[in-house]
Amino acid sequence: MRGARLTGALLALAGLLQVALSLRIAAFNIRTFGETKMSNDTLSNYIVQILNRYDIALIQEVRDSHLTAVGKLLDRLNQDDPNTYHFVVSEPLGRNNYKERYLFVFRPDQVSLLDSYQYNDGCEPCGNDTFSREPAIVKFSSPFTQVKEFAIVPLHAAPSDALAEIDSLYDVYLDVQQKWDMEDIMLMGDFNAGCSYVTSSQWPSIRLRRNPAFWWLIPDTADTTVKSTHCAYDRIVVAGTLLQEAVVPDSAVPFDFQAAYGLNDQTAEAISDHYPVEVTLM
């Protein structure tokens, strides 16, 4: 009996160590994330609950010119410990008066932010820029995973330009490679990479897709939308041997928060029209 208890304790300890020695990373398009959403107790409670699942989370569609909502979000995430989460946020991005930010929240006891930069995609006033919201790239290090340093390239693609923007992520990848002399790069976000925005006949023209160096972890058959549509808009793509080897098999999935929390359609859709997509690194 004593031996059985010891075995059980060791198995439990091994499970805790596996959790501690891994990173869960997500990309979440929180539709129109701003002060209105963070002022709604019900919605903000669920958003915080979702984000607490992750060691690094990319939040897209941040509509918060003065970072008031971002401040409220960090206060909620850090309500028990002021150092639970840190953040890095881009400048407002967009070709017209409509602007969004990329926001990363991360656990500093799990990862360290090493560097960040805004990708230069051309002259916006001249009309020859590539992206509606050019990627704001970050570099992290972690002592707990097989890959010690990696970069994350975020993208919330404009639906009408999704094909061109996804293809141009290849150029961003090359830029990150050269700037930081690194191979282990994760590209993630709401690419609008499905249904009518990118059709099956168009995929072969996308460099990021046809190059075998890139692993697309969220398949075309996935559904990352909350509504009745079935579209794999949100994706995670990884490049680099160490990063690819660190991916826990079958861990890359959409997180269906509606099913997980037993929400009705109205509440789920008020949180967002997208599910987060997530992956675990070991």
Swiss-Prot record:
Cross-referenced PROSITE patterns: DNASE_I_1, DNASE_I_2
Disulfide pattern: 123-126, 195-231
Protein's UniProt keywords contain Secreted: yes
Cofactor(s), by name: Ca(2+); Mg(2+)
Annotated GO MF terms: actin binding; deoxyribonuclease I activity; DNA binding
Enzyme class, broadest EC rank: hydrolase
Highest rank taxon of the organism: Eukaryota
InterPro entries listed in its UniProt record: Deoxyribonuclease-1_AS, DNase_I, DNASE_I_2, Endo/exonu/phosph_ase_sf, Endo/exonuclease/phosphatase
Active-site residues annotated for this sequence: 100, 156
Signal sequence range: 1-22
Key words of the record: Actin-binding, Apoptosis, Calcium, Cytoplasmic vesicle, Disulfide bond, Endonuclease, Glycoprotein, Hydrolase, Nuclease, Nucleus, Secreted, Signal
Site positions (Involved in actin-binding): 35, 89
Function: Serum endocuclease secreted into body fluids by a wide variety of exocrine and endocrine organs. Expressed by non-hematopoietic tissues and preferentially cleaves protein-free DNA. Among other functions, seems to be involved in cell death by apoptosis. Binds specifically to G-actin and blocks actin polymerization. Together with DNASE1L3, plays a key role in degrading neutrophil extracellular traps (NETs). NETs are mainly composed of DNA fibers and are released by neutrophils to bind pathogens during inflammation.
Family according to the record: Belongs to the DNase I family.
Name of this protein: Deoxyribonuclease-1
Upper lineage: Eukaryota, Metazoa, Chordata, Craniata, Vertebrata
